């Protein structure tokens, strides 16, 4: 807008995952398949108070689409549960940057938690007592995050940076799914016999099958990173970084097959091209390697191991286009 006020717009995907196993694998009660896709539209404003202090903030419209399939928890028979749903929700972010001297700056930023409630389709299949489908809801809460960063320019074309990120994964206590009308569940022949012989048990089974929760009970996690940017020319910049992220899983029995997290090592690289003073194109590649515990237990209260994830690796690639008005 002017030399001290900026408007911006970012479109990103802050969270996401996809995982799939065979429907008949031995630990299907711990998860069969899952995917979460997000798109975050974040208009923002920044104000340069003076040569030393800048403030910023924004509001995000976050679209989430999720698909979850899992074996039905113990106690309500066998079979599979599946949910597909999507919806919009809103969060906000705030930031502060301090530049005590020309070649050194510090930043602090905060992003709020999001209460995600999606609407979609709820399915129960292959159960001994009841099966059916209908409208349903999915609920979870994303973590609030705090970033603390520092950037130093020791020489003209080199910038060194460090970052610490705190993510309050305590908010990610569970994922809850419910069917709007449990009468959409139709009793099997065996279920009808149970209903005649024990109406109370049949009611408990209907409630259990129409309200399924996947327990996470995670803890807050930290990420620490170091990086460097080198300007090869006025148009080209290369960069690289390394980061270590702590394990958010409170105890190992809580690890599910759907989100098998652990301590992680990040390795990243990228480059920027400025064809004109107003346009910039950024490209990045990252590799995440799980380096912590990888055991999977029979349930979140069991000491029986049913397996171990041989590898927990991920690869990421991204690109961005920036235009400065």
Language-model features: locations:
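Outer-membrane beta-barrel porins/channels
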Residues: 1-325
